Design a protein with these regions (language model features):
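Second-shell loop/turn segments in exported
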Residues: 12-16, 25, 94, 124-134, ...
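Peptidoglycan-targeting cell-wall enzymes and recognition modules
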Residues: 31-143
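Acidic helix/loop microenvironments that form the catalytic cleft of cell-wall polysaccharide enzymes
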Residues: 30-33, 109, 154-172
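Secretory-pathway/luminal and periplasmic proteins that interact with or process carbohydrate-rich
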Residues: 15, 32-42, 151, 168-174
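N-terminal export signals and maturation junctions of secreted/periplasmic proteins
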Residues: 4-10, 14
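Short, small-residue-biased leader/transition segments that mark boundaries at the very start
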Residues: 1-6, 178-181
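Short "domain-exit" segments at the C-terminal end of structured domains
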Residues: 178-190
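Active-site-adjacent structural elements in enzyme catalytic domains
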Residues: 20-35
């Protein structure tokens, strides 16, 4: 379904994702962020040990164990790690969960949702729903790509800076996949 949306529409050309290097970088980043194009909503279903490794700034092991024991653990984790940043309110506001990652690039935070909604002339609530459709997931990724000027990093092969702008917390896990995809696709004829 994503191939249809991305390649049989004007979406990629409209956002100037139109060279082998740009397409390679875009597809590799989206594939990683969406679990191989399978998930349109961020998965925060962590074990305590993983939670401390990925979000160690917010969780020591006892705190991670307490959060992971909650019946609504994904919501609780999102509210903690996304509190007071990206335009979100504090942990009790529920904004972390409300504005957790959605779409192919996992658009995250009240600020990003608000700007994306404004670019389409829709409400934040409508944008949240749209992000979970094939079209919205793809369009939000393209919008984020353009808004953050990521084509320049694809053009120069600066995968590290590009990745930091998308989600710097997972650089080690991404680097091999991204470099491999970038090399393979950028060798394709234009």
């Amino acid at each position: 379904e994503f191939r249809r949306v991305l390649f049989r529409s004007q979406l990629l050309p409209d956002y100037e994702i139109n060279t082998p290097a740009r397409i390679a970088a875009f597809m590799a980043q989206c594939a990683h962020e969406s679990g191989g194009f399978l998930f349109l909503k961020e998965n925060l279903n962590y074990r305590p040990e993983s939670l401390t490794k990925i979000f160690g700034k917010y969780f020591d092991l006892p705190t991670a164990q307490a959060y992971c024991a909650r019946p609504n653990k994904q919501e609780a984790i999102a509210n903690r790690v996304y509190a007071n940043r990206m335009g979100n309110g504090d942990e009790a506001s529920g904004d972390g969960w409300r504005f957790a990652g959605k779409g192919l690039i996992q658009l995250t935070g009240r600020t990003n949702y608000t700007w994306f909604a404004a670019s389409l002339g829709i409400t934040v609530e409508e944008a949240s729903e749209y992000l979970q459709t094939f079209e919205g997931a793809a369009q939000s990724a393209c919008w984020f790509w353009e808004t953050n000027n990521l084509n320049q990093y694809a053009d120069s092969g600066d995968i590290l800076t590009m990745t930091k702008k998308i989600n710097g917390g997972t650089i080690d896990r991404k680097s091999t996949r991204l470099n491999s995809s970038h090399t393979d696709i950028s060798r394709m004829p234009s």
